């Protein structure tokens, strides 16, 4: 295994991107490169609609924006049942089987994705409600109390996940690949 890893990640083989190459000011839209929007629908013979809504997000090296995005995704559709989308789409209206918002960080960009599963007849209502909740977050800042509670909840989730050995190993591996050190 070490021989195989060394073949791809030796000192002579530079990583594809480093913190220095992620120049936020060189990009537009807060460092997020632009991309053409698309909408693809695949028809399957079932009663359920599975939908993913995505957007480009800050890269691994954009610390301030990255941390804010982690918190935003947790507030919007994190694992807790009190996330905004879970409250509106599942608890209040019963439109979805499940909904979540996730953030994946790469060396040169990132991806925020909201995914949901619902009955096909509820999909348009769900998309409208998601747009409404995102617009609300854009136009009405969270109260200090709600923001403090969201930060506290995220810290609690991170503390619980840090008890998992696999999570610790993945985190150390990411740190080693991205920054050349384990912290």
Annotated model-derived regions:
Residues 84, 89:
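Active-site palm subdomain of RNA-directed nucleic acid polymerases
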Residues 80:
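Conserved phosphate-interacting/catalytic interface
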């Amino acid at each position: 295994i070490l021989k195989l890893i060394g073949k791809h990640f030796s000192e002579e083989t530079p990583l594809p991107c480093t913190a220095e190459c992620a120049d936020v000011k060189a990009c537009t839209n807060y460092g997020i490169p632009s991309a053409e929007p698309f909408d693809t629908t695949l028809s399957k013979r079932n009663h359920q609609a599975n939908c993913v809504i995505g957007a480009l997000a800050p890269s691994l090296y954009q610390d301030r924006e990255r941390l804010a995005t982690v918190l935003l995704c947790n507030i919007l559709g994190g694992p807790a049942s009190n996330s905004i989308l879970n409250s509106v789409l599942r608890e209040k209206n019963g439109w979805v089987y499940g909904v979540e918002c996730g953030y994946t960080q790469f060396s040169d960009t990132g991806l925020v994705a909201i995914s949901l599963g619902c009955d096909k007849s509820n999909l348009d209502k769900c998309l409208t409600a998601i747009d409404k909740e995102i617009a609300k977050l854009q136009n009405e800042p969270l109260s200090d109390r709600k923001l403090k509670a969201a930060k506290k909840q995220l810290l609690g989730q991170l503390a619980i996940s840090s008890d998992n050995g696999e999570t610790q190993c993945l985190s150390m591996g990411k740190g080693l690949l991205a920054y050349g050190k384990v912290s």
